[in-house]
Protein backbone atom coordinates (compact mmCIF):
# COMPACT_ATOMS: atom_id res chain seq x y z
CA UNK A 1 0.00 0.00 0.00
CA UNK A 2 1.28 3.46 -0.89
CA UNK A 3 2.54 5.44 2.12
CA UNK A 4 0.50 8.56 2.85
CA UNK A 5 2.56 11.69 2.20
CA UNK A 6 3.17 14.28 4.90
CA UNK A 7 1.44 17.66 4.67
CA UNK A 8 3.48 20.54 3.29
CA UNK A 9 3.45 24.26 3.98
CA UNK A 10 2.58 26.46 1.04
CA UNK A 11 4.19 29.90 0.74
CA UNK A 12 2.22 32.49 -1.25
CA UNK A 13 4.18 35.60 -2.29
CA UNK A 14 1.62 38.28 -3.18
CA UNK A 15 2.41 41.46 -5.08
CA UNK A 16 1.03 44.69 -6.50
CA UNK A 17 0.01 43.74 -10.04
CA UNK A 18 0.55 47.11 -11.71
CA UNK A 19 3.13 46.80 -14.44
CA UNK A 20 5.28 49.54 -15.99
CA UNK A 21 7.58 49.59 -12.99
CA UNK A 22 5.58 48.79 -9.86
CA UNK A 23 5.40 45.00 -10.01
CA UNK A 24 8.81 44.74 -11.61
CA UNK A 25 10.44 46.63 -8.75
CA UNK A 26 8.90 44.29 -6.18
CA UNK A 27 9.31 40.83 -7.73
CA UNK A 28 12.70 40.02 -6.22
CA UNK A 29 11.94 41.39 -2.75
CA UNK A 30 8.60 39.57 -2.58
CA UNK A 31 9.95 36.23 -3.74
CA UNK A 32 12.90 36.57 -1.35
CA UNK A 33 10.45 36.94 1.54
CA UNK A 34 8.86 33.66 0.49
CA UNK A 35 12.23 31.93 0.21
CA UNK A 36 13.40 33.25 3.59
CA UNK A 37 10.19 32.01 5.20
CA UNK A 38 10.67 28.57 3.67
CA UNK A 39 14.29 28.39 4.84
CA UNK A 40 13.32 29.37 8.38
CA UNK A 41 10.62 26.71 8.62
CA UNK A 42 12.67 23.89 7.10
CA UNK A 43 15.59 24.69 9.41
CA UNK A 44 13.60 25.09 12.64
CA UNK A 45 10.66 22.67 12.44
CA UNK A 46 10.23 18.97 11.88
CA UNK A 47 7.18 16.79 11.55
CA UNK A 48 6.34 14.76 14.65
CA UNK A 49 7.77 11.73 12.86
CA UNK A 50 11.11 13.53 12.59
CA UNK A 51 10.99 14.21 8.85
CA UNK A 52 12.00 17.63 7.59
CA UNK A 53 9.10 19.93 6.76
CA UNK A 54 8.80 20.66 3.06
CA UNK A 55 7.68 24.08 1.85
CA UNK A 56 6.12 24.67 -1.55
CA UNK A 57 6.42 28.17 -3.00
CA UNK A 58 4.05 29.42 -5.69
CA UNK A 59 5.65 29.45 -9.14
CA UNK A 60 5.06 33.19 -9.51
CA UNK A 61 4.14 36.09 -7.33
CA UNK A 62 0.37 36.42 -6.98
CA UNK A 63 -1.26 39.65 -8.10
CA UNK A 64 -4.82 38.56 -8.76
CA UNK A 65 -7.33 35.84 -9.45
CA UNK A 66 -5.49 34.01 -12.23
CA UNK A 67 -2.20 33.63 -10.39
CA UNK A 68 -4.03 32.80 -7.17
CA UNK A 69 -5.84 29.97 -8.96
CA UNK A 70 -2.60 28.68 -10.45
CA UNK A 71 -1.04 28.66 -7.00
CA UNK A 72 -4.01 26.77 -5.58
CA UNK A 73 -3.76 24.16 -8.33
CA UNK A 74 -0.10 23.59 -7.47
CA UNK A 75 -0.80 23.39 -3.75
CA UNK A 76 -3.70 20.97 -4.24
CA UNK A 77 -1.48 18.60 -6.20
CA UNK A 78 1.28 18.63 -3.56
CA UNK A 79 -0.65 18.01 -0.33
CA UNK A 80 -0.24 21.52 1.04
CA UNK A 81 -2.10 21.62 4.35
CA UNK A 82 -1.03 25.03 5.69
CA UNK A 83 -0.38 28.34 3.92
CA UNK A 84 1.57 31.49 4.70
CA UNK A 85 1.04 34.54 2.51
CA UNK A 86 3.92 37.04 2.46
CA UNK A 87 4.27 40.51 1.00
CA UNK A 88 6.29 43.72 1.40
CA UNK A 89 3.75 45.89 -0.40
CA UNK A 90 0.18 46.78 -1.23
CA UNK A 91 -1.73 44.07 -3.09
CA UNK A 92 -5.36 43.50 -3.92
CA UNK A 93 -6.93 42.09 -0.76
CA UNK A 94 -9.72 39.63 -1.49
CA UNK A 95 -8.32 38.88 -4.95
CA UNK A 96 -5.12 37.37 -3.57
CA UNK A 97 -6.07 35.61 -0.33
CA UNK A 98 -6.17 31.86 0.28
CA UNK A 99 -9.85 30.93 0.31
CA UNK A 100 -9.63 27.30 1.44
CA UNK A 101 -11.77 27.30 4.63
CA UNK A 102 -10.20 24.13 6.08
CA UNK A 103 -6.57 25.13 5.75
CA UNK A 104 -4.82 27.11 8.53
CA UNK A 105 -3.50 30.33 7.08
CA UNK A 106 -1.36 33.29 8.08
CA UNK A 107 -0.30 36.53 6.41
CA UNK A 108 3.03 38.23 6.98
CA UNK A 109 2.96 41.89 6.00
CA UNK A 110 6.46 43.39 5.97
CA UNK A 111 6.82 46.41 8.28
CA UNK A 112 8.52 48.88 5.97
CA UNK A 113 7.92 52.47 4.90
CA UNK A 114 8.71 52.37 1.20
CA UNK A 115 5.73 50.14 0.38
CA UNK A 116 2.60 49.56 2.50
CA UNK A 117 2.86 45.90 3.45
CA UNK A 118 0.89 46.67 6.60
CA UNK A 119 -1.93 48.15 4.57
CA UNK A 120 -2.29 44.97 2.53
CA UNK A 121 -2.17 42.92 5.71
CA UNK A 122 -5.05 44.91 7.19
CA UNK A 123 -7.07 44.79 3.97
CA UNK A 124 -6.56 41.07 3.49
CA UNK A 125 -7.45 40.30 7.11
CA UNK A 126 -10.61 42.39 6.75
CA UNK A 127 -11.55 40.25 3.76
CA UNK A 128 -10.87 37.07 5.72
CA UNK A 129 -13.03 38.31 8.59
CA UNK A 130 -15.87 39.39 6.33
CA UNK A 131 -15.86 36.05 4.51
CA UNK A 132 -15.71 33.99 7.71
CA UNK A 133 -12.30 32.46 6.99
CA UNK A 134 -10.06 33.43 9.94
CA UNK A 135 -6.37 34.07 9.33
CA UNK A 136 -3.40 34.80 11.58
CA UNK A 137 -1.68 38.19 11.38
CA UNK A 138 2.11 38.54 11.35
CA UNK A 139 3.53 42.06 11.48
CA UNK A 140 6.93 42.99 12.85
CA UNK A 141 7.15 45.33 15.83
CA UNK A 142 9.91 47.47 14.33
CA UNK A 143 10.24 49.12 10.92
CA UNK A 144 12.75 47.45 8.60
CA UNK A 145 14.60 48.90 5.64
CA UNK A 146 13.41 47.72 2.24
CA UNK A 147 16.66 45.85 1.59
CA UNK A 148 16.68 44.14 5.00
CA UNK A 149 16.14 40.44 4.30
CA UNK A 150 16.36 39.31 7.92
CA UNK A 151 13.37 37.93 9.79
CA UNK A 152 12.94 39.77 13.12
CA UNK A 153 12.70 37.67 16.27
CA UNK A 154 9.04 38.53 16.92
CA UNK A 155 8.09 37.66 13.35
CA UNK A 156 10.06 34.41 13.57
CA UNK A 157 8.27 33.46 16.78
CA UNK A 158 4.85 33.91 15.18
CA UNK A 159 5.83 32.16 11.95
CA UNK A 160 7.12 29.13 13.83
CA UNK A 161 4.22 28.99 16.30
CA UNK A 162 1.75 29.18 13.45
CA UNK A 163 3.63 26.57 11.43
CA UNK A 164 3.85 24.11 14.33
CA UNK A 165 0.16 24.37 15.11
CA UNK A 166 -0.88 24.39 11.46
CA UNK A 167 1.10 21.23 10.73
CA UNK A 168 -0.54 19.56 13.73
CA UNK A 169 -3.96 20.37 12.27
CA UNK A 170 -2.98 19.10 8.83
CA UNK A 171 -1.32 15.97 10.21
CA UNK A 172 -4.39 14.89 12.18
CA UNK A 173 -6.81 15.40 9.30
CA UNK A 174 -7.86 12.14 7.68
CA UNK A 175 -6.31 9.93 10.37
CA UNK A 176 -8.18 7.79 12.89
CA UNK A 177 -8.45 7.24 16.62
CA UNK A 178 -8.33 3.50 17.34
CA UNK A 179 -10.67 2.67 20.20
CA UNK A 180 -9.71 -0.79 21.47
CA UNK A 181 -12.62 -1.69 23.70
CA UNK A 182 -15.30 0.58 25.08
CA UNK A 183 -15.95 2.52 28.26
CA UNK A 184 -13.56 1.82 31.12
CA UNK A 185 -15.06 1.99 34.61
CA UNK A 186 -17.51 4.74 33.63
CA UNK A 187 -14.75 7.19 32.67
CA UNK A 188 -16.38 9.88 30.52
CA UNK A 189 -13.33 10.34 28.31
CA UNK A 190 -13.68 6.75 27.17
CA UNK A 191 -17.20 7.42 25.92
CA UNK A 192 -15.63 8.10 22.53
CA UNK A 193 -17.42 10.99 20.81
CA UNK A 194 -17.33 10.42 17.05
CA UNK A 195 -18.72 13.87 16.30
CA UNK A 196 -15.89 15.52 18.21
CA UNK A 197 -13.23 13.66 16.26
CA UNK A 198 -14.97 14.22 12.93
CA UNK A 199 -16.07 17.85 13.32
CA UNK A 200 -13.19 19.36 15.29
CA UNK A 201 -10.19 17.22 14.28
CA UNK A 202 -11.14 15.89 10.84
CA UNK A 203 -10.52 12.35 12.08
CA UNK A 204 -12.47 9.10 12.09
CA UNK A 205 -12.99 6.70 14.98
CA UNK A 206 -12.18 3.03 14.44
CA UNK A 207 -13.91 0.98 17.15
CA UNK A 208 -12.44 -2.50 17.68
CA UNK A 209 -13.47 -4.92 20.40
CA UNK A 210 -10.75 -6.17 22.73
CA UNK A 211 -11.42 -9.67 21.40
CA UNK A 212 -9.51 -8.60 18.28
CA UNK A 213 -6.41 -8.19 20.43
CA UNK A 214 -7.08 -11.61 21.96
CA UNK A 215 -7.45 -13.12 18.47
CA UNK A 216 -4.19 -11.64 17.24
CA UNK A 217 -2.30 -12.99 20.24
CA UNK A 218 -3.91 -16.43 20.23
CA UNK A 219 -3.67 -16.95 16.47
CA UNK A 220 -0.11 -15.60 16.23
CA UNK A 221 -1.07 -12.66 14.04
CA UNK A 222 2.24 -10.96 14.72
CA UNK A 223 5.90 -11.17 13.76
CA UNK A 224 7.15 -14.16 15.76
CA UNK A 225 10.80 -13.28 15.17
CA UNK A 226 10.16 -9.80 16.56
CA UNK A 227 8.61 -11.31 19.68
CA UNK A 228 11.82 -13.21 20.39
CA UNK A 229 13.78 -9.99 19.90
CA UNK A 230 11.45 -8.13 22.27
CA UNK A 231 11.78 -10.82 24.94
CA UNK A 232 15.57 -10.80 24.68
CA UNK A 233 15.56 -7.01 24.96
CA UNK A 234 13.35 -7.12 28.05
CA UNK A 235 15.58 -9.78 29.62
CA UNK A 236 18.54 -7.47 29.14
CA UNK A 237 16.95 -4.18 30.16
CA UNK A 238 14.11 -4.75 32.61
CA UNK A 239 14.76 -4.33 36.33
CA UNK A 240 11.99 -5.82 38.42
CA UNK A 241 10.65 -4.09 41.50
CA UNK A 242 9.04 -5.30 44.66
CA UNK A 243 6.07 -7.66 44.45
CA UNK A 244 3.69 -6.19 47.01
CA UNK A 245 1.01 -8.84 46.51
CA UNK A 246 -0.06 -11.17 49.29
CA UNK A 247 1.60 -14.58 49.11
CA UNK A 248 -1.46 -16.29 47.64
CA UNK A 249 -1.43 -13.88 44.70
CA UNK A 250 2.28 -14.01 43.87
CA UNK A 251 3.11 -15.72 40.58
CA UNK A 252 5.91 -18.21 40.04
CA UNK A 253 8.70 -17.70 37.52
CA UNK A 254 6.89 -19.46 34.67
CA UNK A 255 3.72 -17.48 35.28
CA UNK A 256 5.65 -14.21 35.38
CA UNK A 257 7.32 -15.13 32.11
CA UNK A 258 3.93 -15.73 30.51
CA UNK A 259 2.71 -12.35 31.75
CA UNK A 260 5.78 -10.61 30.31
CA UNK A 261 5.35 -12.36 26.97
CA UNK A 262 1.70 -11.42 26.68
CA UNK A 263 2.43 -7.82 27.72
CA UNK A 264 5.01 -7.47 24.94
CA UNK A 265 2.62 -9.10 22.48
CA UNK A 266 -0.04 -6.57 23.43
CA UNK A 267 2.37 -3.76 22.57
CA UNK A 268 3.21 -5.35 19.22
CA UNK A 269 -0.40 -6.06 18.29
CA UNK A 270 -1.76 -2.64 19.30
CA UNK A 271 1.04 -1.05 17.27
CA UNK A 272 0.21 -3.25 14.27
CA UNK A 273 -3.47 -2.37 14.59
CA UNK A 274 -2.56 1.32 14.57
CA UNK A 275 -0.10 1.53 11.71
CA UNK A 276 -0.05 -1.87 10.04
CA UNK A 277 2.85 -4.28 9.58
CA UNK A 278 3.94 -5.51 6.17
CA UNK A 279 5.43 -8.64 7.76
CA UNK A 280 1.89 -9.89 8.33
CA UNK A 281 1.17 -9.72 4.61
CA UNK A 282 4.04 -12.14 4.11
CA UNK A 283 2.17 -14.58 6.35
CA UNK A 284 -0.93 -14.29 4.17
CA UNK A 285 -2.62 -11.87 6.58
CA UNK A 286 -3.08 -9.01 4.13
CA UNK A 287 -6.12 -7.45 5.79
CA UNK A 288 -4.48 -7.37 9.22
CA UNK A 289 -1.25 -6.02 7.72
CA UNK A 290 -2.91 -2.74 6.74
CA UNK A 291 -3.77 -1.46 10.21
CA UNK A 292 -6.35 1.25 10.83
CA UNK A 293 -4.45 4.43 9.86
CA UNK A 294 -4.49 5.46 13.52
CA UNK A 295 -2.51 8.47 14.74
CA UNK A 296 -3.69 7.79 18.30
CA UNK A 297 -5.32 4.93 20.17
CA UNK A 298 -6.81 3.95 23.49
CA UNK A 299 -7.09 0.63 25.28
CA UNK A 300 -10.02 0.02 27.64
CA UNK A 301 -8.38 -2.70 29.69
CA UNK A 302 -10.24 -2.31 32.93
CA UNK A 303 -12.03 -4.31 33.78
CA UNK A 304 -13.25 -6.69 31.10
CA UNK A 305 -9.69 -7.45 30.02
CA UNK A 306 -7.68 -6.96 33.18
CA UNK A 307 -9.83 -9.22 35.36
CA UNK A 308 -8.42 -12.20 33.45
CA UNK A 309 -5.53 -11.04 31.23
CA UNK A 310 -2.38 -8.96 31.90
CA UNK A 311 -3.09 -5.24 32.09
CA UNK A 312 -2.05 -2.71 29.47
CA UNK A 313 0.56 -0.92 31.56
CA UNK A 314 3.65 -2.44 29.96
CA UNK A 315 2.26 -2.21 26.44
CA UNK A 316 1.11 1.38 26.86
CA UNK A 317 4.30 2.51 28.60
CA UNK A 318 6.49 1.07 25.85
CA UNK A 319 4.33 2.35 23.00
CA UNK A 320 4.18 5.84 24.51
CA UNK A 321 7.97 5.92 24.93
CA UNK A 322 10.54 6.99 22.33
CA UNK A 323 12.31 3.63 22.28
CA UNK A 324 11.81 -0.12 22.48
CA UNK A 325 13.53 -3.30 21.22
CA UNK A 326 13.82 -1.69 17.78
CA UNK A 327 15.82 1.22 19.20
CA UNK A 328 14.93 4.90 19.33
CA UNK A 329 11.82 5.73 17.32
CA UNK A 330 8.80 8.01 17.24
CA UNK A 331 6.57 7.50 20.28
CA UNK A 332 3.01 6.35 19.74
CA UNK A 333 0.00 7.93 21.42
CA UNK A 334 -1.96 5.35 23.41
CA UNK A 335 -4.41 6.42 26.10
CA UNK A 336 -4.91 4.36 29.22
CA UNK A 337 -8.48 3.24 29.93
CA UNK A 338 -9.37 4.38 26.41
CA UNK A 339 -9.61 7.97 27.69
CA UNK A 340 -9.87 9.41 24.21
CA UNK A 341 -9.96 13.01 25.41
CA UNK A 342 -6.71 12.62 27.29
CA UNK A 343 -5.46 10.81 24.18
CA UNK A 344 -6.26 13.92 22.14
CA UNK A 345 -4.28 16.09 24.57
CA UNK A 346 -1.40 13.61 24.19
CA UNK A 347 -1.78 13.83 20.42
CA UNK A 348 -1.68 17.63 20.50
CA UNK A 349 1.46 17.59 22.64
CA UNK A 350 3.23 15.05 20.47
CA UNK A 351 2.37 16.82 17.23
CA UNK A 352 3.57 20.17 18.57
CA UNK A 353 6.85 18.93 20.07
CA UNK A 354 7.76 15.52 18.62
CA UNK A 355 8.23 14.26 22.18
CA UNK A 356 6.73 11.46 24.24
CA UNK A 357 3.85 12.35 26.56
CA UNK A 358 3.21 11.51 30.21
CA UNK A 359 -0.31 10.19 30.82
CA UNK A 360 -1.25 10.50 34.49
CA UNK A 361 -4.02 10.62 37.04
CA UNK A 362 -4.34 14.07 38.58
CA UNK A 363 -4.35 12.25 41.87
CA UNK A 364 -3.76 14.34 44.97
CA UNK A 365 -3.22 17.95 46.04
CA UNK A 366 -0.73 18.10 48.90
CA UNK A 367 -0.87 21.39 50.78
CA UNK A 368 2.26 22.59 52.60
CA UNK A 369 0.42 22.06 55.88
CA UNK A 370 -0.59 18.48 55.04
CA UNK A 371 2.93 17.57 53.92
CA UNK A 372 4.44 18.91 57.12
CA UNK A 373 1.84 17.12 59.24
CA UNK A 374 2.52 13.77 57.55
CA UNK A 375 6.29 13.97 57.08
CA UNK A 376 7.49 16.49 59.63
CA UNK A 377 9.26 18.34 56.81
CA UNK A 378 8.36 21.57 55.04
CA UNK A 379 8.00 22.01 51.29
CA UNK A 380 10.41 24.52 49.76
CA UNK A 381 11.50 26.01 46.47
CA UNK A 382 9.14 25.38 43.56
CA UNK A 383 7.03 23.23 45.87
CA UNK A 384 6.58 25.81 48.64
CA UNK A 385 2.92 26.53 47.79
CA UNK A 386 1.94 22.88 47.49
CA UNK A 387 2.19 20.14 44.88
CA UNK A 388 0.00 17.88 42.77
CA UNK A 389 0.77 14.17 42.69
CA UNK A 390 0.58 12.96 39.08
CA UNK A 391 0.58 9.17 39.09
CA UNK A 392 -0.99 6.36 37.08
CA UNK A 393 -0.66 2.60 37.19
CA UNK A 394 2.38 2.51 34.96
CA UNK A 395 1.46 3.60 31.43
CA UNK A 396 3.40 6.88 31.36
CA UNK A 397 6.17 7.20 28.77
CA UNK A 398 9.49 6.05 30.20
CA UNK A 399 10.99 9.28 28.84
CA UNK A 400 9.22 10.83 31.82
CA UNK A 401 12.05 9.81 34.12
CA UNK A 402 13.85 12.77 32.46
CA UNK A 403 17.20 11.02 32.14
CA UNK A 404 17.77 12.70 28.79
CA UNK A 405 19.83 15.90 28.78
CA UNK A 406 19.50 19.19 26.91
CA UNK A 407 22.37 21.27 25.53
CA UNK A 408 23.04 22.67 29.02
CA UNK A 409 23.09 19.25 30.64
CA UNK A 410 19.71 19.73 32.31
CA UNK A 411 17.14 16.91 32.59
CA UNK A 412 14.50 16.94 29.87
CA UNK A 413 12.45 14.91 27.39
CA UNK A 414 13.80 15.34 23.87
CA UNK A 415 12.19 14.99 20.47
CA UNK A 416 12.88 11.41 19.48
CA UNK A 417 15.26 12.39 16.68
CA UNK A 418 17.60 13.96 19.25
CA UNK A 419 17.65 11.03 21.70
CA UNK A 420 20.78 8.89 21.86
CA UNK A 421 20.70 5.19 22.61
CA UNK A 422 22.59 5.96 25.81
CA UNK A 423 19.78 8.28 26.93
CA UNK A 424 17.18 5.65 26.12
CA UNK A 425 19.16 3.14 28.16
CA UNK A 426 19.32 5.61 31.05
CA UNK A 427 15.53 5.94 31.08
CA UNK A 428 15.21 2.15 31.13
CA UNK A 429 17.76 1.90 33.93
CA UNK A 430 15.74 4.41 35.97
CA UNK A 431 12.60 2.28 35.62
CA UNK A 432 11.51 -0.69 37.69
CA UNK A 433 8.82 -3.11 36.54
CA UNK A 434 6.62 -4.04 39.47
CA UNK A 435 4.11 -6.90 39.47
CA UNK A 436 0.60 -5.47 39.21
CA UNK A 437 -1.42 -5.27 42.41
CA UNK A 438 -3.86 -8.20 42.33
CA UNK A 439 -6.76 -6.27 43.87
CA UNK A 440 -6.68 -3.93 40.88
CA UNK A 441 -5.47 -6.28 38.16
CA UNK A 442 -6.47 -9.90 38.67
CA UNK A 443 -4.92 -10.92 35.37
CA UNK A 444 -1.52 -9.61 36.42
CA UNK A 445 0.83 -7.41 34.49
CA UNK A 446 3.78 -5.16 35.18
CA UNK A 447 3.61 -1.49 36.14
CA UNK A 448 6.53 0.76 35.31
CA UNK A 449 7.87 2.69 38.28
CA UNK A 450 10.06 5.79 38.00
CA UNK A 451 10.37 9.22 39.56
CA UNK A 452 10.52 12.30 37.34
CA UNK A 453 13.57 14.47 38.03
CA UNK A 454 12.81 17.88 39.50
CA UNK A 455 13.09 21.38 38.06
CA UNK A 456 11.90 20.38 34.59
CA UNK A 457 9.40 22.73 32.88
CA UNK A 458 6.18 21.00 31.86
CA UNK A 459 2.79 21.93 30.45
CA UNK A 460 -0.19 19.96 31.75
CA UNK A 461 -3.22 19.76 29.45
CA UNK A 462 -6.61 18.14 29.16
CA UNK A 463 -9.52 18.20 26.70
CA UNK A 464 -13.05 17.97 28.13
CA UNK A 465 -16.43 17.92 26.42
CA UNK A 466 -19.19 20.06 27.91
CA UNK A 467 -22.77 19.42 26.82
CA UNK A 468 -24.17 22.44 25.03
CA UNK A 469 -20.72 23.93 24.57
CA UNK A 470 -18.50 21.29 23.00
CA UNK A 471 -14.82 20.62 23.62
CA UNK A 472 -12.68 22.86 25.82
CA UNK A 473 -8.96 22.78 26.57
CA UNK A 474 -7.24 23.23 29.94
CA UNK A 475 -3.59 24.27 30.23
CA UNK A 476 -1.35 24.58 33.28
CA UNK A 477 2.33 25.39 32.90
CA UNK A 478 4.61 24.50 35.76
CA UNK A 479 7.56 22.38 36.86
CA UNK A 480 8.33 18.93 38.14
CA UNK A 481 9.55 18.98 41.73
CA UNK A 482 12.17 16.85 43.45
CA UNK A 483 11.31 16.16 47.07
CA UNK A 484 13.72 14.99 49.77
CA UNK A 485 13.88 11.20 49.58
CA UNK A 486 12.30 10.57 52.96
CA UNK A 487 9.44 12.94 52.16
CA UNK A 488 8.87 11.35 48.75
CA UNK A 489 8.91 7.84 50.16
CA UNK A 490 6.31 8.68 52.79
CA UNK A 491 3.97 10.47 50.41
CA UNK A 492 4.39 7.96 47.59
CA UNK A 493 3.68 5.00 49.86
CA UNK A 494 0.31 6.50 50.79
CA UNK A 495 -0.85 6.01 47.17
CA UNK A 496 1.01 3.24 45.38
CA UNK A 497 4.77 2.99 45.35
CA UNK A 498 4.77 0.59 42.38
CA UNK A 499 3.61 3.29 39.96
CA UNK A 500 5.50 6.18 38.26
CA UNK A 501 5.34 9.55 40.01
CA UNK A 502 5.70 13.16 38.93
CA UNK A 503 5.41 15.84 41.62
CA UNK A 504 4.03 18.90 39.80
CA UNK A 505 3.99 22.54 40.87
CA UNK A 506 1.93 24.77 38.55
CA UNK A 507 2.97 28.37 37.99
CA UNK A 508 0.60 30.58 39.97
CA UNK A 509 -0.81 33.93 38.88
CA UNK A 510 -2.79 34.82 42.00
CA UNK A 511 -6.02 34.95 39.97
CA UNK A 512 -8.88 32.58 39.16
CA UNK A 513 -7.94 28.90 38.84
CA UNK A 514 -4.29 29.82 39.38
CA UNK A 515 -4.85 31.64 42.67
CA UNK A 516 -3.12 28.75 44.41
CA UNK A 517 -2.22 25.11 43.78
CA UNK A 518 -5.44 23.92 45.40
CA UNK A 519 -7.43 25.96 42.86
CA UNK A 520 -5.61 24.33 39.96
CA UNK A 521 -6.56 20.89 41.27
CA UNK A 522 -10.11 22.01 42.07
CA UNK A 523 -10.67 23.43 38.58
CA UNK A 524 -9.21 20.49 36.67
CA UNK A 525 -12.01 19.04 34.56
CA UNK A 526 -11.35 15.30 34.77
CA UNK A 527 -9.35 12.62 36.55
CA UNK A 528 -6.59 12.49 33.93
CA UNK A 529 -4.07 14.94 32.51
CA UNK A 530 -1.08 14.98 30.17
CA UNK A 531 2.40 16.39 30.73
CA UNK A 532 4.22 17.79 27.70
CA UNK A 533 7.82 18.90 28.06
CA UNK A 534 8.48 22.64 28.16
CA UNK A 535 6.33 25.68 28.69
CA UNK A 536 4.44 25.29 25.43
CA UNK A 537 1.00 26.46 26.47
CA UNK A 538 1.09 29.20 23.83
CA UNK A 539 1.42 26.58 21.09
CA UNK A 540 -1.59 24.71 22.50
CA UNK A 541 -3.60 27.94 22.51
CA UNK A 542 -2.79 28.62 18.86
CA UNK A 543 -3.65 25.04 17.88
CA UNK A 544 -6.93 25.18 19.81
CA UNK A 545 -7.94 28.39 18.04
CA UNK A 546 -7.32 26.78 14.65
CA UNK A 547 -9.62 23.91 15.62
CA UNK A 548 -12.17 26.25 17.30
CA UNK A 549 -11.69 24.71 20.73
CA UNK A 550 -11.93 27.41 23.42
CA UNK A 551 -9.39 27.42 26.25
CA UNK A 552 -11.20 27.47 29.59
CA UNK A 553 -8.16 27.62 31.87
CA UNK A 554 -4.53 28.62 31.32
CA UNK A 555 -1.64 30.47 32.91
CA UNK A 556 0.15 31.57 29.73
CA UNK A 557 1.41 35.15 29.60
CA UNK A 558 -0.96 37.32 27.57
CA UNK A 559 1.85 38.55 25.32
CA UNK A 560 2.36 34.99 24.06
CA UNK A 561 -1.27 34.33 23.15
CA UNK A 562 -1.59 34.07 19.38
CA UNK A 563 -4.97 33.59 17.75
CA UNK A 564 -6.53 34.58 14.41
CA UNK A 565 -7.01 38.33 13.95
CA UNK A 566 -10.80 38.02 13.82
CA UNK A 567 -10.85 37.01 17.48
CA UNK A 568 -10.27 40.70 18.34
CA UNK A 569 -13.70 41.57 16.91
CA UNK A 570 -15.46 39.30 19.39
CA UNK A 571 -15.20 41.58 22.43
CA UNK A 572 -12.53 43.24 24.54
CA UNK A 573 -11.72 40.49 27.06
CA UNK A 574 -9.26 38.12 25.48
CA UNK A 575 -10.68 34.87 26.91
CA UNK A 576 -14.28 35.84 26.21
CA UNK A 577 -13.19 36.57 22.63
CA UNK A 578 -12.02 32.98 22.35
CA UNK A 579 -15.37 31.53 23.42
CA UNK A 580 -17.40 33.84 21.20
CA UNK A 581 -15.18 33.30 18.16
CA UNK A 582 -15.18 29.52 18.53
CA UNK A 583 -18.97 29.55 18.85
CA UNK A 584 -19.33 31.91 15.90
CA UNK A 585 -17.15 29.96 13.48
CA UNK A 586 -17.99 26.50 14.78
CA UNK A 587 -15.76 23.43 14.47
CA UNK A 588 -13.18 23.52 11.69
CA UNK A 589 -14.75 20.56 9.87
CA UNK A 590 -18.41 21.50 10.35
CA UNK A 591 -20.86 18.61 10.07
UniProtKB/Swiss-Prot annotation:
Catalytic site positions: 337, 361
GO cellular component annotations of the record: cytoplasm
Binding site for Mn(2+): 337, 361, 528
A single GO molecular function term of this UniProt record: arabinose isomerase activity
Catalytic activity: L-fucose = L-fuculose
Keywords linked to the UniProt accession: Carbohydrate metabolism, Cytoplasm, Fucose metabolism, Isomerase, Manganese, Metal-binding
InterPro entries: Fuc/Ara_isomerase_C (IPR004216), Fuc_iso_dom3_sf (IPR038393), Fuc_isomerase_C (IPR015888), Fucose_iso_dom1_sf (IPR038391), Fucose_iso_N1 (IPR012888), Fucose_isomerase (IPR005763), Fucose_isomerase_dom2_sf (IPR038392), Fucose_isomerase_N/cen_sf (IPR009015)
UniProt keyword annotation of Isomerase present: yes
GO biological process, one term: D-arabinose catabolic process
Cofactor requirement: Mn(2+)
One Pfam entry name: Fucose_iso_N1
SUPFAM superfamilies linked to this entry: FucI/AraA C-terminal domain-like, FucI/AraA N-terminal and middle domains
Domain of life: Bacteria
Protein's UniProt keywords contain Ribonucleoprotein: no
Pathway: Carbohydrate degradation; L-fucose degradation; L-lactaldehyde and glycerone phosphate from L-fucose: step 1/3
Described purpose of this protein according to its UniProt entry: Converts the aldose L-fucose into the corresponding ketose L-fuculose.
Family to which the UniProt record says this protein belongs: Belongs to the L-fucose isomerase family.
Quaternary data: Homohexamer.
Name the record gives this protein: L-fucose isomerase
Species annotation: Salmonella heidelberg (strain SL476)
